[in-house]
A protein has these predicted regions:
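Acidic, low-complexity, intrinsically disordered interaction modules
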Residues: 24-69
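Short glycine-rich, low-complexity segments
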Residues: 1-28, 72-83
Length: 83
């Protein structure tokens, strides 16, 4: 999944103050909520960093392994799925 696509959908989730579910290899799911979480994408490394403000912990995910990102908009789920 491209870093640009990841940024677009996570920016939209942030703008709408909604959750984003990030699925990694169909086994692991990260729920980035509107409160207490932040993220950044390192384009040059193709890595997504998820930051939990409460625990002050960072999780790094190679964007190659992200299989899907889903956000909720007006009671509908919208997904970005890796081809």
């Amino acid at each position: 999944m491209t870093t640009d696509a990841i940024n677009v959908i996570l920016d939209k989730a942030w703008e709408l103050n909604t959750h984003a579910l990030i699925f990694v290899d169909d086994r692991t799911r990260f729920d980035i909520g509107p409160d207490g979480w932040d993220w950044r994408v390192y384009d040059d490394l193709e890595v997504l960093c998820i930051y939990n403000k409460e625990s002050n912990m960072e999780t790094y995910i190679d964007t190659e392994y992200i299989s899907e990102i889903t956000i909720q908009i007006d009671d509908e789920q919208h997904s970005l799925v890796k081809n």
